[in-house]
Structure formats: C-alpha cells, structure tokens
C-alpha cells in the first residue's frame, strides 16, 4: 500500500450561537471566533482512503506521497496525515486503530466538557447543559476578569453529587501563597475535583508548596516541565497532553507509568470528530489515559456522520476498522474555505 494523493482542506466551523458572543469577549476578536483547522484526505494505490485532521502542513504533504502509511504512525511531524495513516493501516488490516497501539484495555472513555471563562450565569447554563448531555466532568478556564468562586457557586447550585469540576487557571493564580487563598475558598465546594496549572509551570518549589498544603489533585502539561522532572519532583497527580499526536504521548505515558503510574488527560483531538475519534482509540489501548477533552462538542458541526454520544460521563470507542468514523462530505463542502 502506497500513498498516492493527499488533499489538505482548510475549514472553518462556528461555535454554537449561544457561545459566540462570549467566546468573542474572552478571545478579544473583532468577530465571533471559529474553529479553524485542516481536513486531510489521504488516498492509496489499493483503493483505501484515510481521514485526518490537524494544523496546516502546506506543501509538506508532498513528502508523504509514494510512501507506506505505516512509516508515519510514530512520526508526530505528520500531524493530521499521521491520523489518516492510522485510519488507513487499520482499514487495511481490518482492525480498529487502537490495535496499532496494543491490546485494548477499555471500551469506553471518561469525557470532560470544556468552557472558557464566562460570566457566572453563562457558566451555570453550560454546566446544566453539559450534565444533560451526559458529561460528569467539566473543565472551567479560570481568568482574572471573573471570580472563580462566583463561577463555581453558580455552576454547582443544585447539581448532582457526581458532577465534578476541574479549575484551569493556566498559571494565572500568581504566586503560591496567592493561589492558596483562592484554593482555600474553592475547598468549600465539594464538586470541585482538581486543579490544572494553578500557578506558572516554572515554579517548581511553588508546586511542592501547594502539594503539601492542599488536597486537590493537580494536573500539569506534559512538556512544561518534562514528565520526568514532574515525576521526580512530585509536582503533580495528573498530566495533560495537548497536540502530541502519537510518539510523544506514548513516550510520556510510559515515563509516567514508571513513576507511580500517573494518569493523563488527553486533548490532542480538540477540533473535529475525526481527531476526537483518534484520541478515543489512543485511550482504548494506553492504560494510563484517564480522560479526554474535545471542543468539537461546542461546534455547529463535528464533520463526521456517526453521532458521538456521552452517557453517564463516558463515550464508547468506535468499533469499526481504522478510526471507525466517516467524514461528512456535505459538511466538508459547506465548511471549506479558500
């Protein structure tokens, strides 16, 4: 099997209308922000077609033509083409893509809803919508222009006990002692489950301080500091992997398993159902992936035909060969730009 052609198609997909003005405010853009990404359609000499999604590779896609898709399963530089190669090799073997990572360890994966830093009333509405749509974990982007405590109070009022919140300030809580004051207020809310990067990643001693003073689990991005450093220094309980398509994720998860078996939150399939299906397959085979995050559930179209359903917090891993999902060609024509 050889790659004979690659289509690199840029698309724009609006967020749902209810989110538009709020996303515009937090992103400070002149018009409503959109999901902007690229769909890759990879054709082969055996009649199989693979689908991927990711950043623009430009003319670089020409380098993959004439090669076997298996060459790029662990080449993260291939981005969306790499995802398409998993789809192709799985289809060629008649196996789901997760079999290319190893034995299946789970058939469904815990999902996390995502909301930016909106006013408390909007946060409350999103919390209820998330729960009604099957989510049980909800990630909140905390920022200085809104009170995290007021947001959490609005989000949790009347919510069932199995609803959990991850607070993600992206390092904006300042110094460790400043962060601790806010965290102490959050301790009053049983629904708050974990913190992601409460202070800037370079404050190694600061994370040690927080770990010794709070009970909330802490998550850090897997590349800042390195997984090895974070494990050695005992800085966190979870790692977040973002935009590390395959090789880097496998490597980081292996290091984390060796160091007290820390688990991962993966968000490398943010924008469409294609990349989200890919991360579902990764989670099906990599034992210490704990939950997945995707923004495709916030968009008017996830670009695939099959429904992606969350039930009681979990989403099933696609069962078909390859990625197990089908590109919606009508949606592609409607969303393509340029």
State the predicted function of each range:
Residues 21-23, 67, 73, 184, ...:
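Shared catalytic-loop signature of beta/alpha-barrel
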Residues 7, 51, 199-200, 283:
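Generic short alpha-helical hydrophobic face used as a protein-protein interaction/packing hotspot
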Residues 1-166, 170-184, 188, 213, ...:
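N-terminal capping/lid subdomain adjacent to the active-site entrance of alpha/beta enzymes
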Residues 118-120, 143-148, 169-178, 194-204, ...:
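Short, small-residue-enriched loops and turns at beta-alpha junctions
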Residues 109-115, 138-140, 165-169, 195-196, ...:
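Hydrophobic faces of well-ordered beta-strands that scaffold small-molecule active sites
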């Amino acid at each position: 099997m050889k790659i004979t052609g690659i289509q690199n198609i840029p698309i724009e997909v609006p967020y749902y209308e209810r989110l538009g003005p709020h996303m515009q405010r937090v992103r400070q853009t002149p018009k409503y922000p959109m999901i902007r990404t690229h769909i890759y359609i990879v054709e082969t000499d055996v009649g199989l077609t693979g689908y991927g999604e990711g950043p623009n590779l430009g003319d670089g896609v020409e380098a993959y033509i004439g090669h076997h898709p298996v060459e790029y399963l662990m080449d993260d530089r291939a981005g969306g083409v790499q995802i398409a190669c998993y789809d192709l090799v799985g289809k060629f073997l008649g196996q789901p893509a997760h079999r290319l990572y190893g034995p299946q360890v789970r058939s469904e994966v815990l999902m996390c809803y995502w909301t930016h830093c909106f006013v408390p009333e909007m946060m409350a509405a999103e919390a209820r919508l998330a729960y009604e749509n099957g989510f049980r974990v909800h990630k909140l982007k905390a920022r200085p222009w809104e009170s995290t405590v007021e947001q959490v109070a609005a989000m949790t009022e009347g919510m069932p006990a199995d609803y959990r919140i991850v607070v993600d300030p992206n390092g904006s809580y300042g110094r460790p002692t400043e962060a601790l004051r806010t965290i102490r207020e959050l301790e009053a809310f049983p629904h708050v489950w974990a913190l992601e990067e409460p202070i800037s990643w370079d404050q190694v001693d600061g994370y040690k301080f927080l770990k010794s003073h709070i009970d909330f689990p802490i998550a850090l991005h897997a590349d800042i500091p390195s997984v090895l450093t974070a494990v050695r220094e005992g800085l966190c309980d979870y790692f977040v992997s973002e935009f590390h398509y395959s090789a880097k994720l496998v490597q980081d998860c292996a290091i984390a398993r060796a160091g007290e078996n820390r688990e991962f939150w993966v968000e490398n399939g943010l924008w469409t159902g294609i990349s989200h299906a890919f991360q579902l397959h990764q989670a099906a085979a990599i034992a210490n992936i704990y939950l997945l995050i995707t923004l495709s559930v916030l968009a008017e179209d996830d670009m695939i035909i099959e429904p992606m359903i969350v039930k009681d917090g979990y989403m099933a891993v696609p069962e078909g060969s390859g990625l197990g999902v089908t590109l919606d060609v009508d949606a592609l024509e409607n969303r393509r730009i340029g």
